[in-house]
Design a protein with these regions (language model features):
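Walker A (P-loop) phosphate-binding motif
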Residues: 1-36
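P-loop/Walker-type NTP enzyme "switch/lid" segment
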Residues: 11-14, 32-113
Length: 114
């Protein structure tokens, strides 16, 4: 990990205020609109709503050729693949991010902890 990422933590003790939605929108804007490398760490145990949403998205892509084509076009237009999501717990979020980035050629400009 040569880059030193900027860490953002989106948190609130109140549920249902849009933390995960904000995290997803921020990650997508940074990644696709600004071309920055982003890692999202979903620490929202036990829901892991960002991980669950990503799994639903991948399931739809596997079953629907129209959406698959749209994703391929997005990748070609932006030159960016989908941003990664790591499942963790609140206590282990920073360690999970660092472990993910330390494995292989992975780098991030921004790490978003939800």
């Amino acid at each position: 990990m040569d880059k030193q990422p900027v860490f953002f933590c989106v948190c609130s003790q109140k549920g249902g205020v849009g933390k995960s939605t904000f995290t997803i929108l921020l990650a997508s804007w940074l990644h696709y609109a600004l071309g920055r490398d982003v890692l999202v760490v979903d620490c929202d145990a036990p829901q892991w709503s960002i991980v669950a949403q990503r799994e639903r998205e991948l399931d739809v892509l596997e079953r629907n050729d129209r959406y698959k084509l749209m994703m391929v076009r997005l990748f070609k237009r932006t030159g960016r693949k989908i941003w990664p999501v790591v499942r963790s717990t609140p206590d282990e979020g920073l360690q999970a991010a660092r472990a993910y980035l330390a494995a292989g050629d992975r780098e991030a400009d921004f790490v978003l902890l939800d």
